[in-house]
Amino acid sequence: MEEIGIVIVGGGIAGLATSIALHRKGIKSVVLERAEKVRSEGAGIGTLSNGWRALDQLGVGDRLRLNSSLIHKARTMLIENGKKREFVSNIVDEARCIKRNDLVEALSDALPKGTIRFGSHIVSIEQDKTTLFPVVHLANGNSIKAKVLIGCDGANSIVSDYLQLNPKKAFACRAVRGFTKYPNGHGFPQEVLRIKQGNVLIGRLPLTDNQVFWFLVHMQDNNHNGKDQESIANLCRKWADDLSEDWKEMVKICNVESLTLTHLRYRAPSEIMLGKFRRGTVTVAGDAMHVMGPFLAQGGSAALEDAVVLARCLARKVGPDHGDLLKDCSMKNIEEAIDEYVDERRMRLLGLSVQTYLTGRSLQTSSKVLRLMFIALLLLLFGRDQIRHTRYDCGRL
């Protein structure tokens, strides 16, 4: 049986970022990715200042800035019964939209060759009865014993199942994300614009002068699976039918291949607060740990923060002399490092989880009473500074 110091399950944003963070601390890791190549599905990721701090610690921030534009303002419009209410806030700190594909490529390019093992489909995880370290079983019949196993395998995480975390919950809505190109320029201001009209929430973020990332959420329509790209595009056109002409045009001329349809899910705040995110030397990061709705645009940035904090905590305990973690590093030291990581992340993630949940529910409900209640709770818990979460600093790697 092959033995590896640190095994990371999942080659998405969280997994690649965690591997880079460990690499920059002199600690080797192997990333097991189910797909046959780097996963590039998905449209854009709104990345706020806390995410850019983490990207700079990972050494890829400057590369990603080259293909993204600064966002200067956030604007939300609520249209009800023909009446329009508008809320505007200036963005002082760094905020940009980046292509998910650009981010994944930047992360994968920063890793040593051979770090990512493609086509590695994990079917089960068990604990070795003698050493108590985790053993990963692959679909090809091979097994790997790891000193540390980090699950970065998304919302349907097999590692979170091993940790016996409670199942994720679902918002009663689906979201579509996509890109639209404007060959002659879009002419939109450099702002995040969200419009809530009826059961539809739509928003857009300029990526460059000629390209826009947009999202479309239907708060009640939960019955469409989107069998192919064209059916997703038709669904978007249907949802956007009551919107103004510029929004309908944006959806109509979009890059159909860029569209992704997702059922919005979240890990309950109570699970974030009380969940056991370590079992032996196994833990999770990214969506496997804290999948959340897109309402604060913090899912991707929170995963980047996880990577920095986890690598820092492990490096503090094992040191660069144990780069492959197969030498003298004890299970106790590893467990203590993971506990430090979980403790440091828990309250940060709890705040994001609660704020995201309340924001999503306030947008989703059709009851004015419930909406006012959710807004009152947001003000009570987070004050008038509702973007304070963007100023969080995960610290130096």
Swiss-Prot record:
Transmembrane feature ranges: none
Any single GO CC term annotated in Swiss-Prot or TrEMBL for this entry: endoplasmic reticulum
Matches recorded under Pfam families: FAD_binding_3
Family note: Belongs to the 3-hydroxybenzoate 6-hydroxylase family.
Annotated tissue distribution: Expressed in seedlings, roots, leaves, flowers and siliques.
Protein name: Monooxygenase 1
GO molecular function: FAD binding; monooxygenase activity
EC numbers, comma separated: 1.14.13.-
Subunit structure: Monomer.
Required cofactor(s): FAD
UniProt keyword terms in alphabetical order: FAD, Flavoprotein, Monooxygenase, Oxidoreductase
Induction text: Induced by A.brassicicola, especially in cv. Di-G during compatible interaction.
GO biological process terms held by the UniProt record: response to fungus
Principal EC category: oxidoreductase
